[in-house]
Regions:
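HAD-like aspartate-dependent phosphatase fold
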Residues: 2-140
Length: 140
């Protein structure tokens, strides 16, 4: 796994959290229902044999090869880490990290001091395109 090329930044003479170069995306990718069958934590015996979505494998490995950061962000628990890592390796996914324990239930609303973009997975990994959408923001 390659280390991300973070750029150190200062504001007002003080160091702030580093940033990725603008041309590199920091992808957080769900696992169940996004790159493979949707398997709930209550049925972990199915995780080792989950059906991979070939289009997801190809697209994520393409993004990795282009230098983007690939991190899986899943509702699977730490107890599922070993089977999940083995499954990703078996299918040939290239990635930088995996965050376990994402809150379950959807309806996510991410608040951050950095730019955040969201793409809802609707069944296939195509090219990403620009679209205008209505978003909720804090009142100024």
């Amino acid at each position: 796994m390659k280390k991300p090329p973070l750029v150190e930044t200062t504001e007002g003479g003080k160091m702030v959290s580093p940033k990725l170069p603008a041309h590199i995306k920091n992808f957080l990718i769900d696992i169940d229902g996004t790159i493979c069958d949707d398997i709930p934590n209550e049925e972990p015996w199915r995780m080792a044999d989950a059906e991979v979505f070939p289009e997801a494998l190809a697209r994520l490995n393409e993004w990795y090869a282009e230098g983007h950061i690939i991190t899986f962000f899943t509702s699977r628990t730490e107890a599922h880490r070993e089977v999940t890592e083995a499954w990703l390796k078996k299918h040939g996914f290239n990635y930088h990290g995996m965050l376990m324990g994402k809150p379950r239930g959807g309806n996510y609303h991410w608040i951050d001091d950095r730019e955040v973009r969201a793409t809802r997975y609707l069944g296939h990994f195509s090219e990403l395109v620009e679209k205008r959408a209505t978003v909720q923001v804090f009142e100024e």
